């Protein structure tokens, strides 16, 4: 019921089923995944809010099939890359080194993800990305930038997304207000 109060039902059009349980093959090392009309979520989250965060995040990924060409335009890519460049400068100033061209990739890159998660670590990343990304995970790839912003828009404060990522905010607003959705 809580999800239906949060967002328009039409945004759930690509979701046929939600599975909650133990899915080591599907999830690998993730907490949740959207795939082929289904959302797979681990049952091992500590709180209901964590489950809700996972669900809303995966709803965002489900919207990519319909809205991908609209979402991932040059202006959003430019906003994301600019933030990545600033993150690179912040990390470099603190002695964290990785190939500079990895900051320019918009798609998921396992080497870059491992660098952020394991070498830098999310506690450090959290302090460095405040005001730059709505959360550290949004720095992972442009798809996570979108899904993370969507999640924060619905579960925290849309104004935070607007203030930190104005292009992303406008994309989310336009999807929400799309009568064709």
What is the predicted role of each segment?
Residues 1-37, 44-48, 72-73, 90-103:
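Auxiliary, metal-adjacent structural segments of Zn-dependent hydrolase domains
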Residues 80-117:
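Low-complexity, serine/threonine/proline-enriched polar segments
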Residues 52, 58-77:
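Catalytic Zn2+-binding segment of zinc metalloproteases
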Residues 109-181:
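Pan-zinc metallopeptidase signature
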Residues 33-41, 53-54, 58-62:
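Charged mid-protein connector segments
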Residues 33-34, 39, 66, 79, ...:
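Zinc-dependent metalloendopeptidases
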Residues 49-50, 136:
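Alpha-helical hydrophobic/aromatic positions enriched in membrane-embedded helices and signal peptides
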């Amino acid at each position: 019921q809580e999800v239906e109060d949060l967002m328009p039902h039409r945004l759930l059009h690509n979701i046929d089923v939600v599975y909650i349980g133990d899915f080591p093959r599907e999830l690998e090392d993730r907490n949740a995944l959207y795939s082929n009309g289904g959302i797979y979520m681990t049952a091992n989250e500590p709180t209901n809010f964590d489950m809700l965060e996972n669900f809303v995040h995966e709803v965002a990924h489900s919207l990519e099939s319909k809205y991908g060409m609209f979402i991932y335009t040059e202006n959003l890519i430019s906003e994301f890359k600019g933030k990545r460049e600033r993150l690179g400068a912040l990390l470099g100033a603190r002695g964290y080194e990785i190939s500079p061209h990895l900051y320019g990739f918009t798609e998921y890159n396992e080497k870059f993800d491992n660098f952020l998660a394991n070498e830098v670590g999310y506690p450090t990343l959290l302090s460095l990305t405040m005001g730059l990304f709505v959360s550290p995970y949004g720095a992972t790839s442009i798809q996570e930038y979108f899904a993370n912003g969507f999640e924060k828009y619905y579960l925290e404060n849309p104004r935070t997304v607007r203030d930190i990522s104005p292009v992303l905010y406008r994309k989310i607003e336009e999807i929400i207000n799309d009568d064709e959705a």
